[in-house]
Amino acid sequence: MLAMTKAKAFCQLARFDRPIGSLLLLWPTLWALFLAADGLPNMHVLVVFVLGVVFMRAAGCVINDFADRNFDGHVKRTAKRPMPSGKISEREALGLFGLLVLVSFVLVLTMNTLTIMLSVVGLVLAAAYPFMKRYTHLPQLVLGMAFGWSIPMAYAAQAGELPVVAWLLFTANILWTIAYDTQYAMVDRDDDLKVGIKSAAILFGRFDKIIIGVLQLSTLVTMILIGHSLDLHQIYYWFLLMASGLFVYQQRLIGSREREPCFKAFLNNNYVGMLIFLGIAISVMMQ
């Protein structure tokens, strides 16, 4: 019984019970794989990257909770997490982080040298993000880089090169990530102010909704540029239009700046990523 309780706590620490983060990391990875392959990617590469997304996202959650272990107990949304509640010790958390990183690295060792080299940068970004909340009001920028680093890695693994379009896609993902993670930060803004945690939601203040809108628009413009540069099928743009409709819906949700609607807006971004993926996948398969 004790072992089951501990296993459940480890799963909660790694957020295996909350797949939204994995999905937000997975969609851009799939965008890159399908664009790099100009169709269906190599199956081995696809499986490695999907598994890598799951394990590295879990590792990111573990190190995030380790970094925030002295703050989470003072925040309503995070007070019952495994570390502040005493279910998982600091040593156990670091052990789980090391195990997840090791499994991810074993997976990436089956890729080419360029991909392996890029994975080291990805690990640094993933480990650095949680600590940025102490030093900058834009930890979301670092998160965007960490979440988007799978894009150049995907191009390296699938195509063996890093073309300009890979960095355009990386940029689009950073813009999108800052937008949706600011929505997420709006949920905790009051608590973060009390405990001294920095975030884009605090930095943007009363201009938060406008800046999120600008970031969302910039994401769409960058994705249009990518579609134009690759001469993607017109169906791609119809899916971008549907994604823009979801951005409008999110703006309505965050209008009140209340916790629940802001969190709902954040969760809605899963469908944005999915729509863009479908647009890319269908387009490249039709060409």
UniProtKB/Swiss-Prot annotation:
GO MF annotations, alphabetized: 4-hydroxybenzoate polyprenyltransferase activity
Record carries keyword tRNA-binding: no
Transmembrane portions of the chain: 20-40, 43-63, 94-114, 115-135, 137-157, 159-179, 210-230, 235-255, 266-286
Record-given protein name: 4-hydroxybenzoate octaprenyltransferase
Entry membrane topology: Multi-pass membrane protein
NCBIfam families on file: ubiA_proteo (TIGR01474)
Cofactors, names only: Mg(2+)
Protein EC: 2.5.1.39
Catalytic activity field: all-trans-octaprenyl diphosphate + 4-hydroxybenzoate = 4-hydroxy-3-(all-trans-octaprenyl)benzoate + diphosphate
Entry GO CC: plasma membrane
HAMAP family registered for this protein in UniProt: UbiA
Designated gene of the protein: ubiA
Keywords on record: Cell inner membrane, Cell membrane, Magnesium, Membrane, Transferase, Transmembrane, Transmembrane helix, Ubiquinone biosynthesis
InterPro entries: HB_polyprenyltransferase-like, Prenyltransferase, UbiA_prenyltransferase, UbiA_prenylTrfase_CS, UbiA_sf
Pfam families: UbiA (PF01040)
GO BP terms: ubiquinone biosynthetic process
Pathway membership: Cofactor biosynthesis; ubiquinone biosynthesis
Protein's organism: Photobacterium profundum (strain SS9)
Family as reported in the entry's similarity comment: Belongs to the UbiA prenyltransferase family.
Chief localization: membrane
Subcellular location: Cell inner membrane
Function: Catalyzes the prenylation of para-hydroxybenzoate (PHB) with an all-trans polyprenyl group. Mediates the second step in the final reaction sequence of ubiquinone-8 (UQ-8) biosynthesis, which is the condensation of the polyisoprenoid side chain with PHB, generating the first membrane-bound Q intermediate 3-octaprenyl-4-hydroxybenzoate.
